[in-house]
């Protein structure tokens, strides 16, 4: 104790006689009770877009978009560069060893000297049509055309023989890509097959991963062969790739195999075309040499086509020729080389392919590659479709279809679904910018065939406006279509998508719906029914009234409730509800639907969680406030379901999102002047969302708002009834706040609730809240360790300072006295585990000095209306003033004790903090204390300590010290001038 008293002396340089005091002497530091404060009075107060309209824009390079992939762009460039940089050493045709042509330049291997580009000036000299300009295809297609690259990922994802393993292809930039390690024995086998002279070698049946490995190898070897100027080997690789497309043993994988294999064929075709074109464009020689180059280009193309024509097997011959189809540009003028003639010839040759599935995919490949050559030419596509229909009819009459389904153990629906990608591409190319006559010709083809698969892709490919304007006709088409090639429910689903995207005639909207639903409502399979309903709910929401929407929901419930059929179609129901939320933003209007809430009650498990969240999102985005009991009950029901779906293992981000969602919903509930109902609602919310701190935080603030609203309603004069209500509100806060785990939320709520209780004259409850807040200060962690270590010292200082400001007007307890809360706070501050070298305790003790100064005044600087503070209760009491002075002196001693402990700390940061505390204490003493000899001596010593301890680099603190000295010089008292003169002499 003796050590403590010694340590609390002003400074080591204080005069000895000032430290030796007798118990009878009065305190040396006196409060000034005559400060002129300005008195203040505080008054209380998604249709998913149609699949053929989700368009990726064509690149603005002006060139037709090629199928070569970005991951191999550098490889292709290097291969082309190697091809164009080689030197001419032979006159032998690399594609025909028996060729005795006497030309000096090999059209395939011999590089051409750089010449002026003859194609850019006089392309007509090559005969026939002009070469397609680079921006021709770009100008032809628009946002309504879906590029092939957009279709590829969905094909690779959907068509696989092994659903558990996604297709991975290293050289593809679409879909799922990833490098695949190819076993060395597999690689050797493929390379050996390429070296065989016989072109009739057949590939052995392998698994899906094996086939992908084969294609990986073929692609890699193609690039290597081309870069090494091995043109014959490159052609053999293309042939080998095409042969793989004759195998349909893994029939479910065939569409994906087609996508991968044609990527390799595209690469081959582009390499051939780009090499010839680059050699022509790089030429800058004389006119005579320009003519020679044209002839060489023609000869090169002819040699490629002659060699391809010598392939005995029809399928690889067609695939490889189609891959270099664009090269016909260079030999226009020759016999039978006009593009349309070539395309027609190939389309007729496809009829020789025996497998209808393979034949249809080669039709799609022809359509795709010819689209680069002459996109406006569509007549041959109609003929291809006629061939498809004819083939289907032929095989339906024979045993082929039955045998195929039996061999591959596949259903008819699944088998016909394999044709979808090829048909979709055919019809898209045909329907894009097609004339009405072309569309009518396609429809006539359906009328003759009644093929439902064809009809499905007609509907999906034709413009939605065309479908809507002829909706009755298409509805009849669906009824007339056969049931073998494609399911009826999928036809109606595709039809519904177009009706949503377009605008049917107003006088036909209901008749179309009724006509369709007469058929759909009789579907026996609930999944077929709900698949159509999932699409047509958006049609009803878009084009029909709310009454029709409710009737439509009633029909859905009638189908799915018996035998608990809804349990197997949760995802479809969820999609229906989400579409309803998207189209009807007024949640109050939704709950007025007779059949909407019963639909929400059908969800369970994870679907219930998702739909509960969607329901709350719909409510939270409502633009109007509500007090509808049905809507509130809906909120509490689905809010509780969402609350109960989360636990301690849930991600904190998810908990925060749900909490904010619930808070947003609470903000939408307002009972106006009926504050009792508002409080009852908050009571229900607290019971429902007991685990959400953020919600409880909002509820406490909401109850405080109720108190303020009540105070305004009674104009500051509470009646016995409102007084009881206020007490109930404060009790709600007192009960709710301790249940919040977040200490920072908790502390703020205690402070706010205490203020509200004081404003509403609930003094005993305010006292209890303040006492609880003081107790919980000890639980504030000095350091937070979340993601990074962070000190809470600044927050704690700010909070306690606000708390002290409230204590200024808080009346003392009639039994415990005016100081019991202040002294309790003083004890908590003193015992709190502050960080080492912290001056926070001294800062707060200086705040308490200011509190003591306020209490020493005859009138406090501010008041709360209708609340008698300590200036009215205790100012005239001598015991109050004596105890106040003693407490004031004890605070100064504690501050000096801390300064003595910290002044010898070596680091500059602590030195700066100590210097600031010295200056703060000087200013506090000058402003609130009575300037006597004891105070003057303390100020003198504090100033010298600050001057000595503040580092020379701390310019702001040094300026603060100088300003403090200047302020002392403005004091009018003799004691103040003496201090100033004494300190000035030391400068």
Curated annotation (Swiss-Prot):
Question: What keywords are annotated for this sequence in UniProt?
Answer: Endosome, Protein transport, Transport
Compartments in which it is found = Endosome
Q: Which GO terms describe its biological process?
A: endocytic recycling; protein transport
Write down the superkingdom of origin.
Eukaryota
Q: Which InterPro entries match?
A: VPS35L
Per the record, where are the segments of Basic and acidic residues compositional bias?
43-63
Mark out the compositionally biased spans (Low complexity).
1-23, 66-111
- Record's family? Belongs to the VPS35L family.
Question: What does it do?
Answer: Acts as a component of the retriever complex. The retriever complex is a heterotrimeric complex related to retromer cargo-selective complex (CSC) and essential for retromer-independent retrieval and recycling of numerous cargos.
Quaternary structure, from the entry: Component of the heterotrimeric retriever complex.
Any idea what this protein is called? VPS35 endosomal protein sorting factor-like
């Amino acid at each position: 104790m003796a050590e403590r008293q010694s340590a609390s002396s002003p400074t080591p340089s204080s005069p000895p006689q000032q430290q030796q005091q007798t118990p009878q002497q009065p305190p040396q530091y006196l409060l000034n009770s005559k400060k002129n404060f300005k008195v203040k009075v505080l008054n209380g107060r998604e249709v998913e877009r149609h699949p053929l309209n989700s368009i990726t824009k064509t690149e603005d390079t002006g060139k037709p978009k090629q199928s070569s992939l970005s991951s191999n762009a550098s490889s292709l460039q290097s291969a082309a560069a190697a091809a164009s940089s080689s030197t001419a050493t032979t006159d032998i045709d690399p594609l025909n060893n028996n060729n005795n042509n006497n030309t000096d330049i090999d059209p395939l291997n011999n590089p051409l000297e750089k010449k002026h580009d003859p194609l850019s000036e006089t392309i007509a000299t090559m005969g026939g049509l002009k070469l397609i300009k680079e921006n021709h295809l770009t100008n032809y297609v628009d946002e309504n055309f879906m590029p092939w690259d957009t279709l590829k990922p969905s094909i690779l994802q959907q068509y696989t023989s092994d659903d558990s393993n996604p297709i991975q292809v290293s050289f593809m930039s679409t879909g799922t890509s990833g490098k695949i390690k190819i076993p060395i024995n597999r690689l050797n086998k493929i390379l050996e097959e390429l070296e065989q002279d016989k072109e009739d070698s057949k590939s052995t049946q392998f698994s899906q991963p094996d086939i992908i490995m084969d294609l990986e190898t073929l692609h890699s070897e193609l690039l290597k062969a081309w870069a090494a100027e091995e043109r014959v080997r490159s052609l053999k690789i293309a042939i080998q790739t095409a042969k793989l497309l004759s195998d349909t043993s893994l029939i479910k994988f065939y569409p994906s195999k087609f996508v991968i294999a044609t990527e390799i064929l595209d690469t081959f075709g582009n390499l051939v075309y780009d090499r010839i074109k680059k050699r022509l464009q790089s030429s800058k020689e004389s006119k005579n040499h320009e003519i020679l180059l044209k002839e060489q280009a023609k000869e090169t193309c002819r040699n490629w086509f002659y060699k391809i024509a010598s392939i005995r097997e029809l399928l690889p011959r067609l695939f490889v020729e189609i891959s270099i189809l664009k090269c016909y540009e260079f030999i226009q003028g020759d016999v039978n080389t006009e593009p349309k003639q070539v395309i027609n010839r190939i389309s007729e040759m496809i009829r020789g392919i025996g497998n209808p599935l393979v034949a249809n995919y080669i039709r799609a490949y022809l359509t795709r590659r010819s689209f680069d050559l002459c996109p406006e030419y569509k007549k041959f596509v109609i003929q291809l479709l006629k061939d498809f229909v004819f083939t289907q009819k032929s095989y339906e009459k024979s045993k082929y279809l039955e045998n195929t389904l039996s061999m591959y153990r596949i259903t008819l629906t699944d088998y016909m679904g394999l044709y979808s990608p090829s048909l979709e591409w055919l019809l898209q190319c045909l329907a894009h910018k097609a004339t009405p006559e072309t569309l009518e010709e396609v429809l006539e083809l359906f009328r003759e065939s009644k093929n439902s698969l064809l009809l499905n892709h007609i509907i999906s490919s034709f413009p939605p406006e065309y479908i809507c304007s002829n909706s009755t006709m298409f509805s009849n088409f669906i009824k007339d279509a056969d049931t073998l090639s494609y399911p009826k429910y999928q036809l109606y689903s595709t039809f519904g998508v177009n009706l949503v995207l377009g605008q049917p005639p107003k006088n036909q909207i209901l008749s179309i719906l009724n006509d369709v639903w007469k058929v759909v409502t009789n579907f026996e399979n609930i999944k077929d029914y709900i698949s159509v309903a999932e699409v047509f709910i958006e049609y009803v929401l878009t084009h029909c009234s709310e009454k029709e929407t409710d009737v439509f929901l009633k029909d859905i419930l009638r189908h799915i409730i018996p035998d608990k059929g809804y349990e197997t179609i949760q995802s479809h129901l969820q999609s229906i509800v989400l579409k309803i939320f998207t189209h009807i933003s007024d949640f109050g209007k939704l709950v007025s639907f007779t059949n909407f809430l019963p639909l929400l009650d059908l969800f369970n498990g994870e679907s219930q969680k998702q739909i509960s969240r969607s329901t709350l999102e719909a409510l939270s985005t409502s633009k109007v406030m509500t007090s509808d009991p049905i809507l509130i009950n809906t909120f509490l029901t689905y809010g509780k379901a969402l609350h109960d779906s989360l636990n301690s293992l849930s991600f904190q981000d998810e908990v925060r999102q749900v909490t904010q969602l619930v808070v947003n919903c609470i903000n939408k509930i307002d009972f106006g002047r009926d504050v009792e109902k508002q409080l009852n609602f908050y009571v229900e919310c607290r019971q429902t969302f007991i685990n959400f701190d953020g919600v409880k935080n909002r509820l406490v603030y909401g109850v405080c708002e109720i108190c303020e609203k009540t105070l305004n309603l009674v104009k500051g004069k509470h009646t016995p009834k409102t007084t009881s209500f206020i007490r109930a509100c404060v009790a709600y806060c007192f009960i709710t706040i301790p249940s919040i785990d977040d200490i920072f939320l908790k502390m703020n709520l205690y402070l706010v609730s205490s203020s509200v209780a004081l404003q509403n004259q609930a003094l005993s409850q305010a006292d209890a809240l303040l006492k609880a807040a003081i107790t919980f200060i000890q639980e504030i962690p000095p350091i937070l360790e979340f993601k990074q270590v962070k000190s809470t010292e600044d927050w704690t200082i700010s909070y306690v300072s606000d708390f002290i400001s409230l204590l200024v007007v808080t009346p003392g307890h009639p039994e415990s006295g005016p100081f019991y809360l202040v002294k309790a706070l003083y004890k908590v501050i003193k015992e709190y585990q502050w960080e080492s070298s912290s001056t926070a305790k001294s800062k707060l003790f200086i705040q308490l000095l200011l509190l003591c100064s306020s209490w020493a005044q005859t009138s406090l600087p501010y008041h709360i209306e209708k609340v008698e503070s300590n200036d009215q209760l205790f100012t005239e009491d001598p015991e109050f003033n004596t105890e106040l002075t003693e407490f004031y002196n004890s605070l100064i001693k504690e501050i000096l004790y801390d300064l003595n402990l910290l002044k010898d700390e070596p680091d500059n940061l602590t030195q700066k903090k100590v210097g600031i505390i010295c200056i703060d204490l000087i200013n506090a003493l000058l402003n609130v204390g009575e300037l006597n000899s004891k105070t003057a001596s303390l100020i003198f010593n504090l100033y010298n300590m600050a001057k000595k301890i503040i580092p020379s680099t701390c310019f702001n603190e040094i300026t603060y010290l100088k300003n403090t000295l200047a302020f002392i010089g403005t004091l009018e008292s003799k004691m103040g001038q003496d201090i100033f003169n004494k300190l000035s002499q030391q400068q």
